[in-house]
Amino acid sequence: MANTTSAKKATRKIARRTAVNKARRSRVRNFVRKVEEAIASGDQAVAAAALKAAQPELMRAATKGVMHSNTASRKVSRLAQRVKSLSA
């Protein structure tokens, strides 16, 4: 339990940031799930559109510190690779 005033404030701040980060992470997961569902359905046009929407969300999460930039880049790269393989 936090005793000092500054520690109590830090606890409140952490709780707020955790809520924001959780919402952001959830939003990213939803966008990625839409891409994966489109890939599973085999519709290349829908998958490409979903990827185009998901990419900025992933990079924004990396910019905001929700995930590491390399993680976001890796996810975008792998999704793009899978979407591209649908056309082949």
Curated annotation (Swiss-Prot):
Xref: SUPFAM superfamilies: Ribosomal protein S20
Ribonucleoprotein keyword on record: yes
Keywords assigned by UniProt, alphabetized: Ribonucleoprotein, Ribosomal protein, RNA-binding, rRNA-binding
Gene Ontology MF annotations: small ribosomal subunit rRNA binding; structural constituent of ribosome
InterPro entries the record matches: Ribosomal_bS20, Ribosomal_bS20_sf
One Gene Ontology cellular component annotation held by this UniProt entry: small ribosomal subunit
Position of the signal peptide: none
One family name in Pfam for this protein: Ribosomal_S20p
UniProt-annotated stretches for the region Disordered: 64-88
A Gene Ontology BP annotation from the UniProt entry: translation
Function: Binds directly to 16S ribosomal RNA.
Family affiliation: Belongs to the bacterial ribosomal protein bS20 family.
Protein name (Swiss-Prot/TrEMBL): Small ribosomal subunit protein bS20
Organism: Sinorhizobium medicae (strain WSM419)
